[in-house]
């Protein structure tokens, strides 16, 4: 769920999911269109695509469990949906950490109307 994802993001990046990633660029937050603005926004695009591959799951509300083993995120065994949601969130949180050096405050609260076009997963 968004609760676990937010916790993962904080652990990986040291940033609060809200406001740091809740409306960043064209893809971080609800919906998305256009070309990702930077590597962080691309992480969100890939995360949206990952969720899009889970049509029978509820990624924003389905809870899952994970732990840390030697600093690494390990998704704990749950239902098929829980496992796949956790893996999507894990990949995004790691992607955010790997791209912290290019995170730009100018893309926080980025206006939707500047995001044009369609990008296929």
UniProtKB/Swiss-Prot annotation:
Subunit-level organization: Monomer.
Disulfide bond positions: 26-115, 28-44, 43-95, 49-121, 50-88, 57-81, 75-86
GO cellular component: extracellular region
Entry annotation: catalytic residues: 47, 89
EC primary class: hydrolase
Top-level lineage group: Eukaryota
Annotated EC: 3.1.1.4
Protein name: Basic phospholipase A2 VRV-PL-VIIIa
Organism in which the protein naturally occurs: Daboia russelii (Russel's viper)
Function: Snake venom phospholipase A2 (PLA2) that shows weak neurotoxicity and medium anticoagulant effects by binding to factor Xa (F10) and inhibiting the prothrombinase activity (IC(50) is 130 nM). It also damages vital organs such as lung, liver and kidney, displays edema-inducing activities when injected into the foot pads of mice and induces necrosis of muscle cells when injected into the thigh muscle. Has a low enzymatic activity. PLA2 catalyzes the calcium-dependent hydrolysis of the 2-acyl groups in 3-sn-phosphoglycerides.
Entry coiled-coil feature ranges: none
Gene Ontology biological process terms from the UniProt entry: arachidonate secretion; lipid catabolic process; negative regulation of T cell proliferation; phospholipid metabolic process
Annotated family: Belongs to the phospholipase A2 family. Group II subfamily. D49 sub-subfamily.
Annotated keywords: Blood coagulation cascade inhibiting toxin, Calcium, Disulfide bond, Hemostasis impairing toxin, Hydrolase, Lipid degradation, Lipid metabolism, Metal-binding, Myotoxin, Neurotoxin, Presynaptic neurotoxin, Secreted, Toxin
Cofactor info, note text: Binds 1 Ca(2+) ion.
Positions bound to Ca(2+): 27, 29, 31, 48
CDD domains according to UniProt: PLA2c
Co-factor requirement: Ca(2+)
Tissue expression profile of the protein: Expressed by the venom gland.
Any matching Pfam family: Phospholip_A2_1
Additional remarks: D.russelli pulchella is synonymous with D.russelii.
GO molecular function: calcium ion binding; calcium-dependent phospholipase A2 activity; phospholipid binding; toxin activity
UniProt keyword annotation of Ribonucleoprotein present: no
Activity modulation notes: Oxyphenbutazone (OPB), anisic acid and atropine inhibit the enzymatic activity by binding at the substrate-binding site. P-coumaric acid, resveratrol, spermidine, corticosterone and gramine derivative inhibit the enzymatic activity by binding at the substrate-binding site.
């Amino acid at each position: 769920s968004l609760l676990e994802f937010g916790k993962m993001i904080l652990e990986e990046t040291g940033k609060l999911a809200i406001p740091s990633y809740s409306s960043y660029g064209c893809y971080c937050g609800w919906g998305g269109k256009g070309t990702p603005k930077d590597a962080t926004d691309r992480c969100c695009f890939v995360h949206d695509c990952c969720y899009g591959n889970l049509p029978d799951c509820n990624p924003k509300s389905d809870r899952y469990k994970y732990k840390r083993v030697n600093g690494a995120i390990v998704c704990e065994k749950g239902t098929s949906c829980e496992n796949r949601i956790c893996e999507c969130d894990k990949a995004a949180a790691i992607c955010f950490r790997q791209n912290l050096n290019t995170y730009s405050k100018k893309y926080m609260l980025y206006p939707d109307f500047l995001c044009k076009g369609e990008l296929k997963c």
